[in-house]
């Protein structure tokens, strides 16, 4: 699968490469302090907004990207955002969407994601499908962010709940939306920005148009962005020359009894018809062909009783239908290409505000984003293979009209329905078996903002104060359609079971999940100084009234026919009365009373959170910088639902940092911080599809998960650039996981019986350690005769699990550390023309393979692996360039995987892991997870 074209990076090379990251380095750390203060005087506010040290002194584990960085890196989606940031990965949800980020060995709800300080939706699934066919109800995805609306992104690696609240165990990703000033050029009162981009790997086309103004105290902006794309295509070599041969079942009319020469076979007479018809039989039935029909043909030949032309035609029709299918057309578990997907999104961002008194601002914001991922699951076999003949056995083979294929069907394994039990329910052989998955997201936010701004170190009560209220609703709608209503080989997503299509069938397994947040935040900043010290104090308050609503909705439809024998006609011929086809509608909703997750009624949890935080970033003299902060959170969850957890959680988090600067070129930093995560809404709802719990039984209480982060770093800076090397250690305690726990419950007679209860438990403690390197070399600063603007960048991250301990009374069903990203190096060489007219860059990436030992876990006494395979090492090279024309037009282009290497990333292969929301564990061909081959992106930006 993997062709090794890697480059070697040694410790010597790292040392020589010294001092790198253009994307992570702070402008203020690249030059002397004196020159720094002079060059940043006019952009103090903006620099503070995007600085790595804006919240704590060390900057360790921080990555800050501006909208300019996103444009330069040609970020067209969530998978592009962290392309060159080792240690930060995207969690693939399995159905085209994503489940958030993976940082420091944890992922999903353990990495906080926020926009303008408002938390985004949690990843939510129901453990078990509603329709009984396997899989999971619910999306498991979070809403993705529209990057054209974003001004800055702060990625915080390591526990950080004192800044980001619940969920920041492994880290946090905080987005800030654009302001009017981001669209307006200096010296103007209005501005228009337009952008069009295309990415070939998923054929995504994006167009965005934004306008902003600032006049007489009023300012505002409006941005509209639309995207349309397809599934990400794997390497082109994957499907070259691949062809599948299949043998499928069909129907034939048994006109002759081949065992005897010229003997007619079984015929029947339908009520209302005059002529008898041959019974329909299954073509391709291996047992029948081997033990009867084909054997009889050979016996006839031996007995010199040749078949006549009609008999030979019937024998041919009785054989399996052989087809040769391309890689694009093939359906089944061995499919080598990914499922076809249609992706669309649309987003609005609007802001309007008024400045008055020189220091005050009042404004409002409106966001509305829709995303849809419409997929056809091509691992669902469209045809019925010869290995499925048994399910069509014992069918009468009678039919109405001339389509003899209507005589063959099978009874699906579905829930019993209320109604007439004499109705024959079945799925016809002649219909294509198809499965579609529709994943739709909607996010809407409305907010009000008051901001007070003053000069730093003023005599006023605050340098800055912000009061905001946001009302946000985020919903995911996941619908799985199973259709058997289009005649093979046709595929029709709009078809449904109907009376004119006997034994047609459709089912809908739908799940809605919605979170609502009403968030009130207040923050106050004040800078103080005296002869020896400088302080920057930040005091924060917040209140969040939240609600989680889950609603399953599963409907099934089946076109049924009453079929009953009425005896014989005058010629002793079977005679059937065939009732008219009718559509029988059935619903699992609420039918099985013990399975509460199948009741199609909203299930609600109300939540509230109050927090207060205080942070001080201060310096003593010129040698020491410090940061110290703490936060107090109190969360309440209440519900009227049976067997849903509720409770109060009080959590405290903190952070501290110290920087020692013996000279202006070198510093030593130490950072310590903590994090917590209260149980997610999914964990509060729990699992209740396996047992008939006795009345009064309560789920075991869950504690908040905890995290501790320790980092030490060495930093060099100067005219030559910047280098940071850090070592970190993270410890996680009381991690929540799905597990089996032996519990004694009374049976129907009242006697205690020990059974395994599968649910969420505080099950694990674990620790890991690692190394992180960031840097940038400015070659003109190293040697003055080299061109100004020539640079080299480096990023490296390695994480190694140290220990995992499980509760001895639990049998775990998942392993937490499959989220650890393999070690990765990213080395870049580039040039930016000093006046910004043009630039070019090459990025080299090398990743080690996934360690299989990190995938092993114990389920009881059995050793298991969360995936069947681990990724191998891989390397790739990307080239990008930009050209500015007359300051208003920028053309950007990039070629990725320029060497056209074939490889599989661990993030993609992890979709087969047990922890994936929509797992593809049944795949027998892993080519579908291969990374794209050589691909490109183009972008055209216009500013007026």
From Swiss-Prot:
Signal peptide per UniProt: 1-27
GO molecular function, one term: ferric iron transmembrane transporter activity
Stretches assigned to the TBDR beta-barrel domain: 189-944
Location of the motif TonB C-terminal box: 927-944
Subcellular location: Cell outer membrane
Membrane topology: Multi-pass membrane protein
Protein name: Lactoferrin-binding protein A
Organism annotation: Neisseria meningitidis serogroup A / serotype 4A (strain DSM 15465 / Z2491)
């Amino acid at each position: 699968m993997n062709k090794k074209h890697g480059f070697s990076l040694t410790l010597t090379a790292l040392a020589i490469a010294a001092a790198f990251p253009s994307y992570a380095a702070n402008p203020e750390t690249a030059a002397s302090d004196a020159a720094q203060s002079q060059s940043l005087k006019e952009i103090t506010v903006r620099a503070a907004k995007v600085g790595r040290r804006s919240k704590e002194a060390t900057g360790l584990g921080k990555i800050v990207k501006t909208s300019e960085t996103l444009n330069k890196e040609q970020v067209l989606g969530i998978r592009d955002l962290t392309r060159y940031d080792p240690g930060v990965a995207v969690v693939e949800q399995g159905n085209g969407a994503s489940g958030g980020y993976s940082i420091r060995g944890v992922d999903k709800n353990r990495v906080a994601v926020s926009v303008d300080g408002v938390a985004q939706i949690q990843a939510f699934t129901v453990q078990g499908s509603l329709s009984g066919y396997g899989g999971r109800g619910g999306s498991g995805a979070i809403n993705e962010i529209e990057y054209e609306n974003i001004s800055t992104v702060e990625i915080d690696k390591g526990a950080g709940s004192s800044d980001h609240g619940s969920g920041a165990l492994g880290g946090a990703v905080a987005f800030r939306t654009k302001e009017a000033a981001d669209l307006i050029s200096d010296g103007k009162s209005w501005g228009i920005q337009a952008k069009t981009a295309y990415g070939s790997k998923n054929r995504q086309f994006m167009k965005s148009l934004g306008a902003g103004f600032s006049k007489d105290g009023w300012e505002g902006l409006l941005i509209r962005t639309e995207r349309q794309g397809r599934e990400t295509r794997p390497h082109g070599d994957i499907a070259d020359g691949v062809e599948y041969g299949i043998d499928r079942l069909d129907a034939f009319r048994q006109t002759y009894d081949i065992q005897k020469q010229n003997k007619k076979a079984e015929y029947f007479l339908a009520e209302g018809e005059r002529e008898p018809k041959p019974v329909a039989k299954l073509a391709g039935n291996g047992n029948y062909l081997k033990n009867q029909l084909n054997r009889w043909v050979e016996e006839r030949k031996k007995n010199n009783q040749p078949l006549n032309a009609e008999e030979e035609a019937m024998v041919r029709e009785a054989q399996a239908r052989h087809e040769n299918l391309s890689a694009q057309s093939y359906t089944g578990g061995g499919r080598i290409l990914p499922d076809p997907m249609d992706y669309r999104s649309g987003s609005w961002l609007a802001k309007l505000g008024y400045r008055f008194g020189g220091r005050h601002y009042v404004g409002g914001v409106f966001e509305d984003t829709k995303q849809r991922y419409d997929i056809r699951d091509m691992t669902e076999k469209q045809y019925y293979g010869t290995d499925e003949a048994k399910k069509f056995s014992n069918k009468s083979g009678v039919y109405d009209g001339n389509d003899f294929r209507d005589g063959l069907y099978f009874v699906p394994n579905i829930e019993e329905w209320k109604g007439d039990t004499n109705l024959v329910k079945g799925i016809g052989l002649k219909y294509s078996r198809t499965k579609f998955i529709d994943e739709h997201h909607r996010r809407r936010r409305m907010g009000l903002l008051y901001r007070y701004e003053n000069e730093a170190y003023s005599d006023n009560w605050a340098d800055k104060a912000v009061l905001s209220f946001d009302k946000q609703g985020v919903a995911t709608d996941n619908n799985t359609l199973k259709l058997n209503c289009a005649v093979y080989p046709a595929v029709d997503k709009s078809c449904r079971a109907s009376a004119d299509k006997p034994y047609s069938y459709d089912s809908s397994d739908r799940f809605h999940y919605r979170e609502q947040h009403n968030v009130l935040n207040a923050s106050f900043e004040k800078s103080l100084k005296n002869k020896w010290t400088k302080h920057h104090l930040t005091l924060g308050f917040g209140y969040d009234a939240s609600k989680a609503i889950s609603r399953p909705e599963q409907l099934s439809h089946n076109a049924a026919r009453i079929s009953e024998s009425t005896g014989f006609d005058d010629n002793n011929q079977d005679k059937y009365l065939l009732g008219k086809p009718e559509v029988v509608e059935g619903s699992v909703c609420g039918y099985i009373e013990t399975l509460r997750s199948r009741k199609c009624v909203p299930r609600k949890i109300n939540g509230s959170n109050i927090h207060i935080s205080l942070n001080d970033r201060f310096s003593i003299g010129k040698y020491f910088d410090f940061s110290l902060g703490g936060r107090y959170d109190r969360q309440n969850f209440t519900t009227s639902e049976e067997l849903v957890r509720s409770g109060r959680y009080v959590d405290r988090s903190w952070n501290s940092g110290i920087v020692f600067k013996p000279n202006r070129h070198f510093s030593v930093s130490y950072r310590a911080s903590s994090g917590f995560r209260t149980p997610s809404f999914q964990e509060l709802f729990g699992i209740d599809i396996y047992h008939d719990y006795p009345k009064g039984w309560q789920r075991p209480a869950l504690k908040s998960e905890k995290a501790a982060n320790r980092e030490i770093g060495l930093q060099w800076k100067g005219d030559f650039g910047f280098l940071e090397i850090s070592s970190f250690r993270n410890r996680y305690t009381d991690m929540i996981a799905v597990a089996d726990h032996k519990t004694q419950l009374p049976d129907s007679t009242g006697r205690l019986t020990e059974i395994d209860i599968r649910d969420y438990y505080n099950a694990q403690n674990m620790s890991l350690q690692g190394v992180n390197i960031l840097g940038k070399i400015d070659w003109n600063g190293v040697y003055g005769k080299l061109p100004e603007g020539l640079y080299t960048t480096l990023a490296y991250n390695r994480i190694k699990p140290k220990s995992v301990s499980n509760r001895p009374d639990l049998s775990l069903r998942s392993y937490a550390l499959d989220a650890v990203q393999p070690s990765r190096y990213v080395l870049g060489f580039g040039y930016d023309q000093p006046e910004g007219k043009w630039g070019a860059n090459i990025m080299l990436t090398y990743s080690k393979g996934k360690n299989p030992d990190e995938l092993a876990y114990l389920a009881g006494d059995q050793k298991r692996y969360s995936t069947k395979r681990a990724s191998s090492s891989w390397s790739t090279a990307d080239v990008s360039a930009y050209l500015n024309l007359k300051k208003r037009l920028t053309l950007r282009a990039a070629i990725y995987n320029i060497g056209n290497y074939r490889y599989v990333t661990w993030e993609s292969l992890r979709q087969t892991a047990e922890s994936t929301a929509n797992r593809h564990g049944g795949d027998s061909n892993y080519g579908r997870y291969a990374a794209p081959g050589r691909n490109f992106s183009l972008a055209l930006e216009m500013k007026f």
